[in-house]
Amino acid sequence: MARNDIRPIIKLKSTAGTGYTYVTRKNKRNNPDRITLKKYDPVARKHVEFREER
């Protein structure tokens, strides 16, 4: 199996509506659903939820 099949690169987009994104990798086997993480949005200047983009 190729490296990118199990752990693809995904974009996390801010739910604050600022358009800010983080780029990370995710393990599809352990987390098959869309992930949400609370991270810092420098445009909004606070911690907000970031959701996986497809």
Swiss-Prot record:
Molecular function GO terms recorded: structural constituent of ribosome
Pfam families according to UniProt: Ribosomal_L33 (PF00471)
Gene Ontology biological process terms in this record: translation
Entries under InterPro entries matching the protein: Ribosomal_bL33 (IPR001705), Ribosomal_bL33_CS (IPR018264), Ribosomal_bL33_sf (IPR038584), Ribosomal_zn-bd (IPR011332)
Keywords: Ribonucleoprotein, Ribosomal protein
UniProt xrefs under PROSITE patterns: RIBOSOMAL_L33
Superkingdom field: Bacteria
GO CC terms in record: cytosolic large ribosomal subunit
Similarity comment text for this entry: Belongs to the bacterial ribosomal protein bL33 family.
Protein name: Large ribosomal subunit protein bL33
Species in which this protein is naturally found: Corynebacterium urealyticum (strain ATCC 43042 / DSM 7109)
